[in-house]
Amino acid sequence: MLSTLIRRLSRALLWFVAGSIVLVLVFRWVPPPGTALMVERKVQSWVNGEPIDLQRDWEPWENISDELKVAVIAGEDQKFASHWGFDLPAIQAALAHNERGGNIRGASTLTQQVAKNLFLWSGRSWFRKGLEAWFTALIELFWSKERILEVYLNSAEWGKGVFGAQAAARYHFGVDASRLSRQQAAQLAAVLPSPIKWSASRPSAYVASRAGWIRRQMSQLGGPSYLMQLDSSRKL
């Protein structure tokens, strides 16, 4: 009985490992048709009796403003070009902060956010975190940094039912993602921690201040020229 259960669990684990590897490899080249977060938001809207129409249009790397690419890195993950999916010092700092109490601080890299939004559900359980770590490792192994950022920018939530850079640019500023200015890009990046609560087009004093900080960080990183470092600066 026990041996049968172990064999079945082992077989299920093997299928999961193989399936997840194949899925990550496919999305290395094929645009994901949607994300787990989009499904979650759609289901939540049905449960709440307020169905929403999801807005999302996939745009390739070259059709997204370099200003937005750098703004997102500046605001969310300044070590993106050099790490392998995990920012250990940031994780340690977040754990120490959370142990002291107060608002919970996260330390997710852009790669971890892609893994979570694309494949997993919301939550803070250790099981989900373990799956997130697994998918993060696979993404870093099989995708380029450019691809990771491209998928992130096409999957990030930027408002109620608004997903991806193109939908966000049209919704908040009435322009295409390729034509976003540095200020607009900074405001979009500023609301990423709480895109439902905060508005990029009608920024609160806090969001405006955060956008200003992001612009300064963009300049310190070197602006769009920073993108040349992607896939050439990773540290073992």
Curated annotation (Swiss-Prot):
List the membrane topology term(s): Single-pass membrane protein
Checking Gene3D superfamilies in the record gives: Biosynthetic peptidoglycan transglycosylase-like
| GO biological process: one example | regulation of cell shape
What is catalyzed by this enzyme? [GlcNAc-(1->4)-Mur2Ac(oyl-L-Ala-gamma-D-Glu-L-Lys-D-Ala-D-Ala)](n)-di-trans,octa-cis-undecaprenyl diphosphate + beta-D-GlcNAc-(1->4)-Mur2Ac(oyl-L-Ala-gamma-D-Glu-L-Lys-D-Ala-D-Ala)-di-trans,octa-cis-undecaprenyl diphosphate = [GlcNAc-(1->4)-Mur2Ac(oyl-L-Ala-gamma-D-Glu-L-Lys-D-Ala-D-Ala)](n+1)-di-trans,octa-cis-undecaprenyl diphosphate + di-trans,octa-cis-undecaprenyl diphosphate + H(+)
Task: Indicate whether ATP-binding appears among the record's keywords.
Answer: no
Return any one Pfam family short name. Transgly
GO CC, alphabetical: peptidoglycan-based cell wall; plasma membrane
A GO MF term = pentosyltransferase activity
Pathway given in the UniProt record: Cell wall biogenesis; peptidoglycan biosynthesis
Any stretches that span the bilayer, and where are they? 12-31
Query: Which compartments does it reside in?
Result: Cell inner membrane
* InterPro entries, A to Z: Glyco_trans_51, Lysozyme-like_dom_sf, PBP_transglycosylase, Pep_trsgly
User: What EC identifiers does the entry list?
Assistant: 2.4.99.28
UniProt function note: Peptidoglycan polymerase that catalyzes glycan chain elongation from lipid-linked precursors.
NCBIfam families referenced in this protein's UniProt entry, alphabetically: mono_pep_trsgly (TIGR02070)
Would you identify the family this protein belongs to, as annotated? Belongs to the glycosyltransferase 51 family.
The name this protein goes by in its record: Biosynthetic peptidoglycan transglycosylase
Organism from which the protein derives = Pseudomonas putida (strain ATCC 47054 / DSM 6125 / CFBP 8728 / NCIMB 11950 / KT2440)
Q: Which gene name does the record give? A: mtgA
